Amino acid sequence: DGGIGSVPFPLVADLTRGISLAYGVLSEEGESYYPQGVAMRATFIVDTKGIVRHQLVNDEPLGRNIDEVIRVLDALQFFEENGQVCPAGWTSGQTGMSNTPSGVASYLSEHAEKL
């Protein structure tokens, strides 16, 4: 039959550039290495509630890093499953921390030698 199978979100084309404009990825003259009116490369990570939790917009000379996108996805999934936030430099398999003053203090004291 072809196609990509069942996906839980719509696939769209942006023929009028309205989506690119709404998401702020449409290049403007003098603000980007892209020609005016071209959509810059962008990644938006949306949580299970439909909230954009991370966005990354790359101008033409900057390459994307799929490993960082995967790390951010892992961090979001970790938060959704455990309710703990992921500190700077966090990678999958590491501990998170409570986003309270005492939780941050506890995490920092436990990991002081590594920081």
Please state what every model-predicted region is:
Residues D1-L115:
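Chalcogenol-based redox active-site neighborhoods
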